[in-house]
Swiss-Prot record:
Belongs to the tRNA pseudouridine synthase TruA family. This is tRNA pseudouridine synthase A. Its EC number is 5.4.99.12. Substrate binds at Y109. It is an enzyme of class 5 (isomerase). Keywords: Isomerase, tRNA processing. GO terms for molecular function: RNA binding; tRNA pseudouridine(38-40) synthase activity. Pfam families: PseudoU_synth_1. The lineage of its organism: Bacteria, Pseudomonadati, Pseudomonadota, Betaproteobacteria, Burkholderiales. It comes from Polaromonas sp. (strain JS666 / ATCC BAA-500). CDD domains: PseudoU_synth_EcTruA. It catalyses: uridine(38/39/40) in tRNA = pseudouridine(38/39/40) in tRNA. PANTHER family: PSEUDOURIDYLATE SYNTHASE (PTHR11142), TRNA PSEUDOURIDINE SYNTHASE-LIKE 1 (PTHR11142:SF0). It comes from the Bacteria.
Amino acid sequence: MRIALGISYSGSAYEGWQSQLSGNTVQDKLESALARFAAQPVRTLCAGRTDAGVHGLMQVVHFDTVLHRDMGSWVRGTNAFLPSDIAVQWAREVPDTFHCRGSAIARRYAYVVLESPVRPSVEAGRVGWVYRPLDGAAMRQAITHLVGEHDFSSFRAAQCQAKSPVKTINRIEISERAGTGSKYWHFEFEANAFLHHMIRNIMGCLVAIGQGSHEPGWLLDVMAARSRDAAAPTFSPNGLYFLGPVYEDHYGLPNRTAAYDWLP
């Protein structure tokens, strides 16, 4: 049988999602916990690999097993062996044709950025940080150039293994919430797929525009160049959240977890 799990995690202490020799990745911790609960090795595939420091609100994985246990047992049993900053949120039996990555029709990410003259402390690692004010109108104008199908080579990491740089961004939304002498900015992205570091590189450009270093139309020049050298520096992974994949309704998989309501 094939089982899908929804996983949430804080990425601050880990070297990203994908398994490494060090064993200090989210995938390594999850597979170790699953193996202890199932008393046999378990290999997982994920909907989207995240970098070191990036958090996941609803990563989705799947694996095949001959064990027949109720779905609640997979949640409680696996969580019993996971560190406190990783948790299985739900488990569902899915058809053998389901693939957590291949069946996804879209992926969603969010950036939470603190605008403040003082760096974050309690929120360290959970928010990005800028100390110069951001111009929301300029950034909102800039994102209109990104929505749709484009060649995103200028936002692609050198080590990206994607076959094509052409992706379709369905939507980008920017909102803000005033704090005491500060602001929390919330950027949400949805696309059919993302290139390696694509969101972090886009964020670097949006921050540069928001701080007045470039005009919104500069993004058109960046995209036309199809060169990473044309774009702004990569933004910090702090404050970046993988909100999860989007699947067709007939799979019956949840699309939110409680952590969504926690985001600033």
